[in-house]
Amino acid sequence: MENKYSIILGNLGNTCDRFCKSYKTNPSSERMLELAAENMPYIGGVELVGTWDIRPDNAKEMKKRLDGYGLECASIIPDTFGDSDYGKGSVSSIDPAVRRKALDYLRSMCEVALQVDCRIVNLWMAQDGYDYLLTADYDREREWMTEAIRALASEFPSLKIALEYKPKEPRNFSYHARMADTILAAQETGCRNVGVTIDTGHGFVGGENVAESIVLAKRAGDRLFHMHFNDNHGCWDDDMIVSSVHMTTYIEMMFWLRKTGYDGWLSMDQYPYREDAIGAISESLHWIKKYETIVDERYDEIERLIGLNLSLIHISEPTRQ
C-alpha cells in the first residue's frame, strides 16, 4: 500500500519553550518550503499553520509556490493557540466577542483552504479548556464549541474539519483531550464532515493505545481524517523522532490504518528543539516508511497472529530455532 506523506512546515523553523525564546534562527515560510521540497524524502504535501505560514493575503502566492514544487497543501492548521485574545478560550470563551472573533477567523482560514485546494482544516483548539477546578462550566463551554464547529462544517461542506485532541498544554485540561471525548464532539455536530486527527504523541500522553483509537474512529463512522506522527516517553508531548521510544506500537498502528482503509495523509509533527530539523524529520519519515513496508510484507502474518491471540508466543519462536 502506498501512503501519502507530509510534514508540518513550521517544524523546520524556530523552536522555543518557556525557558528559551529561540533555540534556532527562524527561516521564512518560503525558505522552509524550499528546504522541504529539496530535502524531505517521500513527501507529497505540507501542512501550513495560519498566521505562521498562510493568511488570506498570501494564499495565492503560497499556492503558486506549492504548485512549483509539486506539493499539495495537506492541511491548514488555524492559529487559535498563539493569539493572547484566545488565552481563556477561543470558541469556548465566556466572552461572546471573543467567540465571534474566533469563528470569523476560522471561517477565513476555511476560505483560504479552498483557495489552495486543501481539503482538511485541522482544528487544534489548544486554548479551549481550563486550568483550575470550579472555574469552568463544562457543559455550556462544550456546547459553544459544538455550535461553532457545526457552523463551520455546515458552511464549508466540501472541507473535512478534523479535531485534533491532546490531554493538556497549554491548558491543564483540554476539552478535546482523548479519542472518546473528541469522537463525541464530532458526532454531536451532526455533520459527516467533522472527524478527528490522531497525533500519536498526544495519544501516548493520554494513555491510549493509538491502534485501538484508530479502530474507534472507524467504528464511529470513518471519522479518522488525519494523522500526525511523533514520539515521547508517555508523560509529556515531547514531539520526538518517531521510534525513539516506541517500535511495536507503530507497527500495530500501520497495520490498523491499512486494515481500516485509512487513505489520508501520514504527517510528521515534531519539535526538534536542538536537533537538525531536516535530519530529525527525515528520520521519522524513514521509520514510518519502514513500518509501512513491514506491514505490507507481513500483513497476512500479523492478521493471523492477532486472530490467534498468541502473537507474543509466535513472535518468539524464530529465536528458538
Q: Predicted segment positions?
A:
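Active-site-proximal loop/turn and secondary-structure-junction residues that shape catalytic pockets
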Residues: N11-G13, G50-W52, D79-G82, M125-G129, ...
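Gly/Pro-rich active-site loop or hairpin
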Residues: G13-P27, S93, A136, N172-I183, ...
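Structural motif
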Residues: N39-P41, V116, F156, T260
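A contiguous, mid-protein "functional segment" used to position or interact
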Residues: T260-L310
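Active-site acidic/histidine proton-transfer and metal-coordination neighborhood
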Residues: G68, C73, D85-G195
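Generic structural signal for well-ordered alpha-helices
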Residues: E30-A37, A59-K63, L106-C110, M145-A153, ...
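N-terminal pre-domain/capping segments
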Residues: M1-S108, L114, K289-S316, R320
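Hydrophobic faces of well-ordered beta-strands that scaffold small-molecule active sites
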Residues: N3-L9, G44-L48, C73-P78, V121-L123, ...
